[in-house]
């Protein structure tokens, strides 16, 4: 009989599969974490903004996904505790995107194993945390009594390893291994389309000449558009927003015609107290 309240193990299921209606949101969560880490690295003076990047590799045949950033990384002396924490975050919730300390758990619902690999500048060691997601599903069976609370279960599926690393390296890498095909996470075209619509990436100025005008206007109003360099595949091709100088009109293939963006106009309004109410642009 329990004498103290317990945060039960089934919370882990809620924080993984139960959090996201769309598996693609896993990409969003990891990119948010990478963006925050890059911001911290730039603020700390160990990374130039021009060199900051998030690299996504999708191996459909091998059923694996790797998302890596060259942000701050996690120092060796606090790596284990930070990666084992659940619902704990040192993010401010204002300037940083994530703040609940649960986003990284999303991948556990869509892989057989998830690895978090990280090293911080000055450390000659990298830490690898491996989460056994198959084991997690076994422990979360109603008939399984091996564990009872969320932390006991999380510890039971987690293992740590340390390996030598160049002390000048700083990064955080997420590896999703054994990703099911039916999740859609391995379809690179769908992933790129999702990221082009949701990720904090730049316009392609060659495809959309009005990009500079939009950037300049937002900066002049005090709302610069924050963008990150997100690269894909072995060739590290940049991912851009989908805007272009032309678009197709008409629903049937034979009747499709081109329409062109000739210019953009801006909308901006302030509230009665003088604070900005909204800002945007129309093509």
Predicted region positions:
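Conserved ATP-binding N-box helix of the HATPase_c
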Residues: 20-56, 103-109
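Helical mechanochemical/support elements of P-loop NTPase systems and associated helical scaffolds
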Residues: 7, 11, 23-26, 79, ...
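Conserved aromatic-histidine-acidic binding/catalytic patches
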Residues: 18, 22, 71, 98-102
